[in-house]
Every structure is written in structure tokens, then in C-alpha cells.
Amino acid sequence: MDRDEELTLENLKLCRSIIDPIIDKYDGRIFYTAGDSVIADFESPVSSVNAAIEFQKTILKRNNTIKNDFKLVWRVGIHLDDVIIEGNNIFGTGVNIAARLEAACSPGQILISGAVKEQVINKINTNIADAGTKVLKNISSSYQTFGISPSGEDIVKTNAKEYANNKKIKSYKPKLAV
């Protein structure tokens, strides 16, 4: 295996050792993982947003300690919708929309739909900024989206800016759709 691939795999495992317990802490259930992507379901939008904020902050702290290795910068899409659960699988338009929101994110960003914003706006301590209307691949409607920054700390811009401006960083953009 190429050294970069080995290092990436080690870093991915380390990030998952951070992310998975946080998802569990907020009563989330991981349904699917493939390489650098995770699909999880939560009992409430508040839980999903709090989990995303906590792990983005934790991953950012981790990345700030890495000098010449790979940094993994995650993107998170969160949507609220009905889903179908069969055994260990999760299906439905809601899953697709969350995945498309994640794909529309900048590295380090948490992007939520308007439905999620309405549920969390007065229930969590965070900054929520209008991120514009997005046309999502293979989704018939466009969606109003919002970016989240934890407690006044602009994690969205910090991670994305670091990723864009630091040419020395070899970074991959793992994904989490909830």
C-alpha cells in the first residue's frame, strides 16, 4: 500500500474513533460507512446538530496538532425528513437530501436544510447563517440552506479557509450525512 494511503487510513480510523462515540453520545445510529463517509440517523434535529458541532470542533482541534501529515476535514449535511429503516439499512428522500447537502458543503462546513433550522433555531447555542438556495443533484426541489458555526466560533470559515490557503496540507474531505 502506498504510504499516503496508509497514513490516510490511519487518520481516518483516528477520526472515526472521535466521531463514532460522539454520534452515540447524542443517541445517533450509524447506518452506513464507506471509506470516508458516514450516514447516521438521530432522534431529533437538535441532537444531530449538537453532535455535528461537537465533532467538528474536536476534529478541528485534532487537525491543529498535526503538522506534516494528512488532515481530514469533514463536511456535514443535515436534513429532517421521514425515512424508512429496514434492519441495518436506511432509505428515503431525506437520506438523499442530507447526502446532497453534504456534497454542497465546503470542507469543515455544517450545512442544514430549512426544516432543520426551524427545529433548532431557539434550542441550540450556535450561529446559523443563510447559505443560500441550493439545487441538489437528482432532487426535484431546491432547498434553502444554512451554515452552522458553534458558539460564535466560525468553524465553517476557519476550516474551509485553512484548507484552501494551506498548500502544504494534503487533506481529504470525509463526509457525514445525517
Go through the PLM ranges and name each one.
Residues 32, 68-70, 169-172:
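Short, flexible hinge/linker loops that cap or flank conserved catalytic cores
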Residues 1-51, 58:
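Catalytic NTP-binding/metal-coordinating core of nucleotidyl cyclase/transferase enzymes
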Residues 14, 76, 152-155:
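Bimodal feature
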Residues 138-165:
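N-terminal intrinsically disordered, acidic low-complexity segments at the extreme N-terminus
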Residues 39-142, 149:
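Catalytic beta-strand-to-alpha-helix segment of the class III nucleotidyl cyclase homology domain
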Residues 25-28, 65-66, 165-167:
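Short beta-strand/turn micro-motifs at beta-sheet edges
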Residues 164-178:
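Acidic, proline/glycine-rich low-complexity intrinsically disordered segments
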